[in-house]
From Swiss-Prot:
Keywords: Aminoacyl-tRNA synthetase, ATP-binding, Cytoplasm, Ligase, Nucleotide-binding, Protein biosynthesis. InterPro entries: DALR_anticod-bd (IPR008909), Gly-tRNA-synth_bsu (IPR015944), Gly-tRNA-synth_heterodimer (IPR006194). This is Glycine--tRNA ligase beta subunit. It catalyses: tRNA(Gly) + glycine + ATP = glycyl-tRNA(Gly) + AMP + diphosphate. It is found in: Cytoplasm. GO terms for biological process: arginyl-tRNA aminoacylation; glycyl-tRNA aminoacylation.
Length: 688
């Protein structure tokens, strides 16, 4: 009989960042194992808190589904003679499958009939299977930094302290890492009554909530957000949406209670990042703002427990935050004693990477790349000067106490200190914008100088790493090279900006001045492949089909924005009534054109009018296509190319390309090569 199943793995405190992927994997592998064991169910979900990972399955079958297997044997004519008497082939096959020969059945496979052995395996009880499945599931979970404890060789995210496993009202027993499963769980570490008996799986959620544990992360997030907003509203304030902080806070606790604390209003004189960073990043508090978005001298924290004694908890948190803000204020005022531009020489003492020199040398490379990009992207004289100045100052804030204590403020504090040193607002903004887009963020540089610096910094990092033979492998990417490549793609796609990355990376390589160990050509090829992989995923994530993406990228992707515009034009072109015929015609031409020795066409060698017709059509269309490509009007270029379909079809209908006469054959191949290459300036339609 179907009944709910609860499997709970009780652990020491799991870091908040590990919880979401652990629950996703628990659900995924739970589904896979239940399918493997043929156990039917209505619904499955994973829940968790810092102290437990829970798989809950609704209406799990009481028995395994029976398995019917049909094993193909010899052809019927070989298994039985004309009188229907089994031959040695039939007898041997039946014996090998453990069935009686009279139980063999026949099945038609096309025009031939074969004999089959039908074997039925009775389903085992779910309790028996779950005792096997439980240890397999727990052992299959993978974590970034698993631990061992005691004398166990078993590894898990944190030490396992208990295992609850109940199917309906039946206890499922097994052992993992020396811990025996049973019908017991534990509530809140400080507020519950101790060990709790789960008599049936359906009691699980209610029992834990009565003991101050909200197992469902989504419900905890809702509770946290409602309480945080209410606490801020009590001080006539609001809290900005912050899904990342909300998720982290919800995964740090089991039973939320929010409170609103305050800090001295004098701290509001400091730049906002100096206040928000200690609150958000270090204390996991929600800053409170007024109706205009300005910070108020309040914060909202969330306590893991009930609302009892909240005044005492609030007071303790206020003391902690005041100490944090006092430190931040001291660092900020200390930093102002040395103007940002005066810190540059000290970068000679800061190592960028051991094999890639100092931060001072990196700044020199960024300055050179800023000059190159200013020309490549068409910056005016004012913007060029701003980009140059921003590059010179770009890393000076790394020497400040604020950035040393709060590394996440790099660039942000550079902007603040640049403004206080009298730098132009665009220069100060560019120093901040060099790190945009931030991981998971959508903000892009608003200044041209910021775009230049953001591109230059990432290119220097990528070329330096690849130039020293360092590339991401599998899940390992210690220098976040994939993220930096995606950052370049987003910058060029969404700003938007046209830039030849091959040329850009050659400039970045040259800026290292012979320091790199991998040859320039090899680095260029590796980076081209690396970016191609990123763009395949990115373009498909933005709604383009696999075929469209492959067709566009096959025509080149050194210019990311240009590749995107070609791809979107091809996607639109797919709706052309004759697209399939055009694609087929191009593919035929392209396949034969691979045999062409060149592209020189001699009209005097034409033997048939269809050759003249195709050549004249090509000349006329080429002029239109090249004019449209020069303006990046790829939709219009494809529309012009569509006019070649009929002449190409007539060409193939009228002549044989691979004739014995070499000169005629090569002339026809060259003509097809011209046609194919014209298409491939936009996309390779043979990829469809």
């Amino acid at each position: 009989m179907a009944a709910d199943l609860v499997l709970e793995i009780g652990t020491e405190e799991i870091p908040a960042r590990f919880l979401p992927p652990a629950l996703a994997e628990l659900a995924e592998k739970g589904r896979a194992l239940l399918a493997e064991y043929r156990l039917a169910y209505a619904d499955l979900a994973a829940y968790g808190t810092p102290r437990r990972l829970t798989l809950y399955v609704r209406d799990l079958a009481g028995d395994q589904a029976p398995l019917v297997q049909e094993i193909k044997g010899p052809p019927k004519k070989a298994a039985f003679d004309i009188d229907g008497v089994p031959t040695k082939a039939a007898l041997g096959f039946a014996r090998s499958q453990g069935v009686a020969v009279e139980d063999l059945v026949t099945r038609a496979v096309g025009p031939v009939e074969y004999v089959y052995a039908v074997r039925q395996e009775t389903g085992r009880p779910a309790a028996e299977i779950l005792a096997e499945l439980g240890p397999r599931l727990i052992g299959a979970l993978v974590f970034p930094r698993p631990m061992r404890w005691g004398d166990q060789d078993f590894r898990f995210v944190r030490p396992i302290r208990w295992i609850l496993c109940v199917h309906g009202d039946r206890v499922i027993e097994f052992t993992v890492a020396g811990v025996r499963s049973g019908p017991h769980t534990w509530g809140h570490r400080f507020l519950s009554a101790g060990r709790l008996l789960v008599t049936t799986a359906g009691d699980y959620f209610t029992l834990l909530e009565e003991n101050f544990v909200i197992v469902d992360p989504a419900r905890r997030r809702e509770m946290v957000w409602e309480q945080v907003r209410a606490a801020a509203a009590a001080e006539s304030g609001t809290v900005a949406d912050d899904p990342e902080l909300l998720a982290e806070v919800a995964d740090l606790l089991e039973y939320p209670s929010a409170f609103c604390g305050c800090f001295p209003e004098s701290y509001l004189e400091l730049p906002e990042p100096v206040l928000v960073t200690p609150m958000r990043e270090h204390q996991r508090y929600f800053p409170v703002r007024d109706g205009t978005g300005r910070l108020m001298p309040f914060f909202v924290g969330v306590h893991n427990g009930t609302a009892e004694h909240l005044n005492l908890i609030r007071s303790g948190n206020e003391k902690v935050l005041r100490a944090r803000l006092a430190d931040a204020a001291f660092f900020f005022r200390e930093d102002l004693e040395v103007p940002l531009p005066d810190r540059g020489p000290e970068l000679k003492k800061v190592v960028f990477q051991e094999s890639l020199g100092t931060m001072h040398e990196k700044v020199e490379r960024l300055t050179a790349l800023a000059g190159y990009l200013s020309s490549a992207l068409g910056l005016d004289e004012t913007e060029r000067a701003q980009a140059h100045r921003a590059a010179v100052l770009s890393k000076n804030d790394l020497l400040t106490s604020m950035v040393y204590e709060f590394p996440e403020l790099q660039g942000i504090m550079g902007r603040e200190y640049a403004l206080r040193a009298g730098e132009a607002p665009a220069v100060a903004e560019a120093i901040r914008e060099q790190y945009l887009p931030a991981p998971g963020g959508e903000e892009l540089p608003a200044t041209r100088a910021g775009l230049v610096l953001a591109l230059a910094d990432r290119a220097d990092n990528l070329v330096g790493a690849f130039g020293m033979g360092v590339q991401p492998t599998g899940s390992q990417d210690p220098y976040a090279l994939r993220r930096q490549a995606l950052g370049i793609c987003h910058l060029l796609l969404d700003t938007p900006a046209y830039l030849d990355l091959d040329d850009f990376f050659r400039e970045a390589y040259a800026a290292y001045g012979g320091r790199l160990t991998v040859e320039a050509g090899e680095v260029a090829a590796q980076l081209a492949d690396f970016f191609g992989q990123r763009l395949r995923v990115l373009f498909q994530d933005r709604g383009l089909s696999y075929g469209v993406v492959e067709a566009a990228l096959a025509a080149g992707h050194a210019d990311v924005r240009d590749a995107w515009e070609r791809a979107t034009a091809v996607a639109t072109f797919q709706s052309h009534p004759a697209f399939a015929d055009i694609s087929t015609a191009f593919t035929r031409a392209n396949n034969l054109a691979k045999n062409a020795a060149g592209t020189r066409v001699e009209p005097a060698l034409f033997k048939d009018p269809v050759e003249h017709t195709l050549y004249q059509a090509f000349l006329q269309v080429r002029e239109q296509v090249e004019a449209q490509i020069a303006r990046r009007r790829y939709g219009a270029a494809l529309a012009a190319l569509a006019e070649l379909r009929e002449p190409v079809d007539r060409f193939f209908d009228g002549v044989m390309v691979m004739v014995e006469e070499a000169a005629v054959r090569e002339n026809r191949l060259a003509l097809l090569r011209l046609v194919a290459d014209l298409f491939k300036g936009i996309a390779d339609l043979s990829k469809f």
